[in-house]
């Protein structure tokens, strides 16, 4: 790569949107987890908030597929970014990435987006709680704290199934060995089948264990990411001890595609059953300016559902207002948007909405 690649005059800054990137490195983190590192062909500074995520635009067996992954790298290393992916037995996308994505592969990403980050919630004392591959956004935050010499009292508690499942193990130990105010605690559900010894905490994270590791956990800003049962257990401990939940922040993995399809089918059946009971005067018109198509929909139906009924395909990944993939511009009218961090305040001010979680309050016009 030539020195001109890093010319600050020609270097662009990453903004929320659609970008072409190329895989430049693949790292085997554990037996079933890989990190994929990306750069742009034209120099781009990948600025984002530690904890945010991107959505990959892929083609698998001839079908367009969108999937969101947290950025595991730190914005303090701005010319590239990384995602860390666990290979799931029935995971269509994760298996495809592990089998097909290699150095030189090109793809499209959308983002960065997400409210789960340490920039918007600064604190002097931080507790990070992660389970399994939920360590990825917290690793981005930890790398950021380390690289920027942040004056933060950080306690990090990570739970893994076995010692060989500990993601970023060596790097975490390196980081926490060099900063006096950083403390690392690792919990393994059990030892390795190979018999590898594990002298650390064993079992599942519980109140007694948390109190032993982090006695002042109720005084900290808490960032949590992991499987739903893990986060549910964490919240139960916190709430039962009077923790102020305004200082608790979490990132979940969301529903699986099968769950989303089941929800869609259930809602479609419900909508059909209720159609006869709806006064047509209550229905609202949704117009799509680029296609010249419009449709009247029932109250509480989303802009995305309106587009689908017209045969218009607005890209979508999570279906829950998290990933930001379905962002479109509203030209007229009012909507109610109940998102989960997938859109910035700046984009909202500019008239953008997330079609998957926006329901019209009046007749609306959409640029699509």
From Swiss-Prot:
Optimum pH is 7.5 (for flavin reductase activity). Keywords: 2Fe-2S, FAD, Flavoprotein, Iron, Iron-sulfur, Metal-binding, Monooxygenase, Oxidoreductase. It comes from the Bacteria. GO terms for molecular function: 2 iron, 2 sulfur cluster binding; metal ion binding; monooxygenase activity. It catalyses: glycine betaine + NADH + O2 + H(+) = N,N-dimethylglycine + formaldehyde + NAD(+) + H2O. Binds 1 FAD per subunit. FAD is the native cofactor, but activity is slightly higher with FMN. Binds 1 2Fe-2S cluster per subunit. Disruption phenotype: Can use glucose or dimethylglycine as the sole carbon source, but is incapable of growth on glycine betaine as the sole source of carbon. CDD domains: fer2, FNR_iron_sulfur_binding_1. Its EC number is 1.14.13.251. [2Fe-2S] cluster binds at residues 318, 323, 326, 356. Residues 16-119 form the FAD-binding FR-type domain. Involved in degradation of glycine betaine. Part of a Rieske-type oxygenase system that catalyzes the conversion of glycine betaine (GB) to dimethylglycine (DMG). This subunit is the ferredoxin reductase component of the system. NADH is the preferred electron donor. This is Glycine betaine monooxygenase reductase subunit.
